[in-house]
Amino acid sequence: MARANRGEHSTLSTFWQSRHNAASFDPLYRRIDVNAPEPSDSATPEKTPSKHFIRQAIDADLASGRFDGVATRFPPEPNGYLHIGHAKSICLNFGLAKDMGGTCNLRFDDTNPIKEDTEYVDSIQEDVRWLGFEWDNLHFASDYFDQLYDWAEQLVKDGKAYVCDLTAEETREYRGTLTEPGKNSPHRDRTPEKNLELLRAMKAGKFKDGEKTLRAKIDMASPNINLRDPVMYRIAHVPHHRTGDKWCIYPMYDWAHGQSDSLEKITFSICTLEFEHHRPLYNWYCENLGIHHPRQIEFARLNMTFTVMSKRKLLQLVKENHVTGWDDPRMPTLVGLRRRGYTPESIRSFCADIGVAKFNSTIDVIRLENSVREHLNSVAPRRMAVLDPIKLTITNWPEGKVEMMNAINNPEDESAGSREIPFSGELYIETEDFREEAPRKFFRLKKGGSVRLRSGYIVDCHDVVKDADGNVTEVLCTYDPETKSGEDTSGRKVKGTIHWVSREHAQKVTVRNYDRLFKVENPDASSDTGSFLDHLNPDSLTTLTAHVEPALAEAAVGDRVQFERLGYYVVDPDSTDGEIIFNRIVPLRDTWGKIEAKGKK
């Protein structure tokens, strides 16, 4: 029976632990509410690509003496779960620090208490550690609220910031457009003394939400809209998850981000490409405060086929019950991929494989799927499972005889050893592996044909049993005792090999065959009147009862295996002592590629 208790060890768990040391062994993580795995040692991407443009820029800055070391950070906002796109940033920032003997901080940009929660703080830390990284320092932007406020007063005193009474809607109207300059706020020319008085009144809670803002005084005619007197502070009488009710004004992201980098002595602030036009503002704040000035470098964010990455859309999927939660195995979240059975090694390898680019592009999800196939092919033990069974009876098998067959655990790894599988006169095979009348190139079992049973014997089909509707319910075969795998003396050659389980000894399990959540490459490119939800794949989950070999009866949560000839599977946390549940990670081959190829013909 399945054991969800991670302190217990099954045969498969023992197998996995013998294959990996503590840093790489990964029992599948819990559903969001159970203990996280132990932090692993600092890890680096599995592949070492040639130097990308960010590495070249860092090398140049170090050579010129602009900086004397590498200090990076991963700065998520704790308002949701991380997804595969964040994994790219994590691998990049932590990987650069590791490769170059530097440091990498984990900093939570917790400047918006309306959307943030400690649940996300905890889950993000778990995800970073699960990927194999450990931060040098853990920080929160809220740790710097006092210093940020002091610097705001400094800019006010210097005449470089002012308190504005415009509403949010009026502020947008005054900002202008990409083709039209903005207009100065009617409050832009207040004296520094008056602005300081108003700012302190804002801090003291004397105004309502949205009544006033603090804005930087830069240039309302700038071609860069981000420099048109950006808001630095807004009023929000909302308790903060760390500071409580101490503050009723909160810094905007652009104001908090660069200054937090500066306080932590970050040297390279690596951001995704959408922040490229924010870089002049990042620089303006550092220069006008006269503080340590990190270099901001942007790279292309990860976009992937058959996937949506928008936090808003992912939230919609959860809220409208299109998925079971943030950790649904069809979601691109790290908690979802983790529950699906993806390994941290495969995700790091994927991030290294796709590289770092300056321009946005879309990566084929096949590359992510292939990364986990490649990793699990080398480490996952093989087991036999029949998902859609039909009975196969060996008519010349001695009655009551059970023979133990020796089966290799992993042909890619000799040290993985072998196991014993019971073989009897009544077996289950896959329904699709038999045809009463088969096409010419059907090399599996057919009436009048022969096939090898993996790790067993060659069998010859001589008849079938049908029900009242004419459906085949049983396949009748004889076996050739001279053809036992590993001891074959018959000299017979057959073209097909199929898997099987002994009917008497098979264990019943639940299998969840997960597939891609969307049926089109780009769900965001919806029709004029439609929505990305119109492209949901109705067949993204199929649940069935399967029959598996006895070795899987003791499978524990997190055990990953290859169901021979079918795909890679992992034991789901929903498993109980009475029911083992296997999630399909990926099939052995890219079935979508075949479907698309047929569609193009």
Curated annotation (Swiss-Prot):
A single GO BP: glutamyl-tRNA aminoacylation
Enzyme class, UniProt record, top EC level: ligase
GO cellular component: cytosol
Cross-referenced InterPro entries: aa-tRNA-synth_I_CS, Gln-tRNA-synth, Gln/Glu-tRNA_Ligase, Gln_tRNA_ligase_bac, Glu/Gln-tRNA-synth, Glu/Gln-tRNA-synth_Ib_cat-dom, Glu/Gln-tRNA-synth_Ib_codon-bd, Rbsml_bL25/Gln-tRNA_synth_N
Entry keyword annotation includes Methyltransferase: no
Location of the motif 'HIGH' region: 76-86
Residues bound to L-glutamine: D109, Y253
Localization (cell): Cytoplasm
EC number assigned by the record: 6.1.1.18
Annotated GO MF terms: ATP binding; glutamine-tRNA ligase activity
Gene3D superfamilies: HUPs, Ribosomal Protein L25, Chain P
Renumbered ranges of motif 'KMSKS' region: 308-312
Alphabetized UniProt keyword annotations: Aminoacyl-tRNA synthetase, ATP-binding, Cytoplasm, Ligase, Nucleotide-binding, Protein biosynthesis
CDD domains per the UniProt record, alphabetical: GlnRS_core
PANTHER family: GLUTAMATE--TRNA LIGASE, GLUTAMINE-TRNA LIGASE
Family: Belongs to the class-I aminoacyl-tRNA synthetase family.
Protein name in UniProt: Glutamine--tRNA ligase
Organism: Rhodopirellula baltica (strain DSM 10527 / NCIMB 13988 / SH1)
Highest classification ranks of the organism: Bacteria, Pseudomonadati, Planctomycetota, Planctomycetia, Pirellulales
